[in-house]
Amino acid sequence: MSNLSANDLLKKVRKIEIKTRALSHQIFAGEYHSAFKGRGMAFSEVREYQYGDDVRNMDWNVTARLRSPYVKVFEEERELTVVLLVDVSRSRLFGTAGASRKDILAEIAAVLSFSAIINNDKVGAHFFSDKVEKFIPPKKGRSHLLHIIREIIEFEPTTDGTDISEALRYLTNAIKKKCTAFLLSDMIDVNEDGSPRYEEALKVAVNRHDLSVIEVYDPRERCIPDVGLVHIKDSESGRSAWVDTSDKKMRRAYEDWFRNVGQLSSKLFMKYNVDKVSIAVDDDYVKGLMTLFQNR
């Protein structure tokens, strides 16, 4: 668990609630409702036939029994199940712009959750590192939502790595009916050539669920300033090395690697029609989420 006291944790959760609930009510509720559809049409009632009704909806049993034409009425089955796949690996603690990825992930998760609750949808979450660390089954209600936010802030992973494939496989197996899923991560889970390691799991998951990717990153992590000889350590692998940051070729190669990773992941998401938005920790995430909702 985190080092926050119970009182500090409560204050932080409350602060996030006040900020994100207002955003959800004022900005996102309508966009969310339009962007994410229900599972289809569900039977509502039987009523007397009216001129213009589709004869394909005639209820012939009721018509025969009452000796008057009756039709079946259908309504959109609006209620969704929303699942947040939250990357809780060590890299989420990185932050040089006043906020860590952990902070921004919590706020984005809260906005999505409040938007869902406003629309009477269920919300659940599972946290992953290189394994699924915790699963919170989908439910409705403010207290459940605040439980999810508190867990995101407080949770500490038992391992250090990242395995997006494991998270996607768990989604496919644990949630049997189609859900609306949001994958929140820095998306750095790649092979040596920069290609995503999770293509097969992604392919299976999107056949069952409506998946969107929200990449949260710190731009300062993806470029190295010229500050001479420095000691760096990977928060997930634990490996460390001395690096001469005055070497222009090294800095350029480092930036090119991240650029290649981004291009390959974007290409993969386009291949499987997965909506993706990238949000920097020092950017306004409201704009990013609006873009995600409006582009659907």
Where are these regions (language model features)?
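An amphipathic, basic-hydrophobic helix/alpha-beta surface used to engage anionic
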Residues: M1-K139, T180, L184-S185, E192, ...
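A conditional alpha-helix N-cap/helix-loop micro-motif detector
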Residues: A106, D160-I164, G194-S195, F258
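A generic local structural motif
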Residues: P69-V71, A167-Y170, Y198-E200
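Von Willebrand factor
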Residues: H144-C179, N191-E192, D218-P219
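Von Willebrand factor type A / integrin I
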Residues: M1-A35, E45, N173-K177, G194-R296
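Short amphipathic alpha-helical interaction patches enriched in hydrophobic/aromatic residues
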Residues: R92, T96, I152-E156, N273-K276
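Short, electropositive alpha-helical surface patch
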Residues: F135-E151, Q294-N295
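Well-ordered alpha-helical segments embedded in enzymatic catalytic cores
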Residues: I108, E166-Y170, V261
